[in-house]
Amino acid sequence: MTVIDDILEKIVSKKIEKKEALKFFEELPENEKNYMVSKLKTHLSNSVNMVENNFSDKKDNTLKAVTELQLNEEHKGFIDQMAQKLERTAPKSKENASKCQEYFVDQRRTGGLKKALKRLQFHLTYSKGDGAYLYDIDDNKYIDIASDNGVNLFGHQPAFIKEAISKRLDKGYPLVGYTEELSQATKLFSELTGHERVLFTQSGTEAVMWAIRIARAATQKKKIVIFEGAYHGLSDTVLAAKDQFGNSIAMGLGMIQEFADELIVLDYGNMDDLNIIEDRADEIAGVLVEPVQSRNPANQPIDFLKEVRKLTLEKNILLVMDEMITGFRVCCNGVQGLWKIKGDLATYGKIPAGGMPSGMIAGLTKYMNYVDGGVFDYDDNSMPSVKKALMAGTHTRNPIKLASTLSILTEIKKRCSTSENETCDSNSCFLQELNEKTRLMCEELNSFFKVKKVPLIIEYFSSLFRFKFLDDPNGVVKEFVFVLMRMNGVETSPSGNCFLTVAHSDKDIKSIIRIVKKSIDTLLKENFFYVSDSIEEDEIEENIQSAIPDIPDMRNDPEQESIKNDQMEKLRKLIISDLNNFQEKEVTI
């Protein structure tokens, strides 16, 4: 999480008082102040829209989650009871989590961390993973729905992967030169996805970074279009946010504006934004898209993406489909096969890597040739015909990961009779059965949430699902639900993405449903949800929205700079006033 996102999270979850929020705001660089104001405005409108879209009768659904500032002594007492219980059941994990901090730098350790829940939020230390289950060093067993962030389609340590890796280890794993798994894995990858050539990288982030380099090399253009809400890894080349003027801005510490300047950030599914692509086509090398965003799985704008494909073909722009999570999940040839929208390039990395650190780029030969110059014959006068873009990596064709990939692809092909460029259906692909189980589980839980009138839904696509808390998306109750699920035997992921796998039995799924319901019922019993005055809060939201002015983009007009500064000062005062209103009236933005 970047500094600016951390501040926003503190404000929207009401973890800080208004004076502290203002102090943070004043210390921000000017571009991040713009970003923060823009995001606060967006969050206000989105919060209202989410509730209205998911609950048609607001009068019958008036429960709200308490915020961290609203926790009373009874809430704190219950949290303390749970902390004591967890310390009794997982003492070794807590001790090891504390020991690790001194030397191990963990970027995930503070994800979702709440001061009120800190005693409950240490990471578990696992002793093993097997099938659908994780076991910690205190001998506790958990149903795993984190699925190693989407890697484990077949669960932990399936026999066919263990056998393939073991055989490769016995032969050694030379990193220079080819091994027999290389040609087999790339051929099978191409057959299953319908792409012509394949490149292995060392991570998903690296795959996306190289795909962008290929797009720029092929088109001799610089700009890359990305969409708000997407996640494409941690390369500076794809990390930018959009300010209130629609300009791309660097997202946080260590990220420079020059990288953000080469990105165009648009709204995914907004047909009007296609005009921006058309108007700036001469600058744009590629459009990078998660066809179904892992952070927003309910947003599935098929018609929009079809128009993007049509436009990119017309304008000499590469369409890069990031199927890091959806690839080999929704069906063998991913969302591209399901929606019949093929990218020029596509990136992969989780399922086909089989748990090994890897990424893949696949695509049309004419573009993939920018990596190695193209195919030539060793026995004639032919030579590489395309000028190469610089790419390298010691572990790109590591034989251990290739053995794992080959075993995964072989298993998928064995279980799915769908042929190349054919869409999976319920009669031909084992993945459809898994997708249906996920749908049924999520729909049962969504019905439960509606009956209980809690502001929570599960959004899902294929076997991916996410818990979305509607009124306080980053709040203490959200994290407490996950803590209680863990304490009752279901492990989730700090990223928020959850998955069912082939290894989950019907009994496991029933247990997941039971434990989620139990966790919500516990928080209802302990008054972590309360009845709100929805009419009064609607009026407050409307007043706040009308109070915040629209600021024209005056960045290129020096004479108007003082006007902009005056307006920023007014916004600054409005933020203070808004925060005061939110806290006094207990409104969650």
Segments (PLM) and residue ranges:
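Charged/polar low-complexity intrinsically disordered segments, enriched in acidic residues
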Residues: 4, 8, 551-559
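Conserved N-terminal phosphate-binding loop of PLP-dependent enzymes in the Aspartate aminotransferase
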Residues: 41-552
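Charge-rich, solvent-exposed alpha-helical interaction surfaces
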Residues: 3-10, 20, 24-27, 35-39, ...
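Charged, low-complexity interaction regions
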Residues: 15-17, 33
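Long, low-complexity, intrinsically disordered segments
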Residues: 561-589
